[in-house]
A protein has these predicted regions:
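P-loop (Walker A) phosphate-binding loop of NTP-binding proteins
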Residues: 25-26
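Pre-Walker A (Motif I) flank of P-loop NTPase domains
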Residues: 14-22
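Conserved glycine(s) of the Walker
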Residues: 29
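N-terminal pre-Walker A segment at the start of P-loop NTPase domains
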Residues: 1-13
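Post-Walker A helix-loop "phosphate-sensing" segment adjacent to the P-loop in P-loop NTPases
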Residues: 38-46
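Short glycine-rich substrate-engagement loop in P-loop NTPases that contacts/grips substrate
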Residues: 50-80
């Protein structure tokens, strides 16, 4: 599976969105695969929930939604600072982005990061047909997106 992921990373360089989502059931090995890739490339995967949560905690409630995207871009820039520019950005644990009070589109935010840099991210939901789904329909954090413009690697 690691070899397949590495091949995909090499193939997405010319795409408009250079985003690969690792998708699979809970405990299927998505995070483990991301860590294996990180170890091979000597890159530490970014724990988005931890890093972004720290910064949002210092942001007033009424500005968090507006700030979340900018803070994520800042964190991503800091993460790649000093790294080889061709190295992909590895993202994990970005469930915080689905918080309804932020009123943001998590997939769009991650897609925007992937316009200029390859991004490999663990999708915290599942793939249903051609739809990326996060949480059940009855859950306040429920989201349903088309997988258009995203390379999906099913685990």
């Amino acid at each position: 599976m690691l070899a397949k992921l590495e091949r995909l990373i090499g193939e997405i360089g010319d795409l408009n969105s250079k985003l690969i989502l690792l998708v699979g059931p809970s405990r299927s090995g998505k995070t483990q695969l991301l860590r294996q890739l990180g170890a091979k490339l000597n890159i530490e995967p970014l724990n988005v929930g931890l890093e972004l949560g720290r910064r949002l905690a210092a942001t007033p409630n009424n500005k968090r939604g507006f700030s979340a995207g900018e803070l994520l871009r800042e964190i991503a820039l800091l993460e790649q600072f000093g790294e080889r520019t061709e190295a992909p950005l590895l993202l994990d644990n970005f469930e915080l982005l689905f918080e309804p009070s932020l009123q943001i589109n998590p997939l769009d935010l991650v897609r925007r990061l992937a316009h200029s840099k390859r991004v490999v991210a663990v999708w915290p939901g599942e793939l249903r047909g051609d739809r990326l789904v996060y949480a059940d329909m009855s859950h306040p954090e429920h989201r349903d997106y088309s997988r258009d413009g995203v390379v999906v690697l099913e685990i």
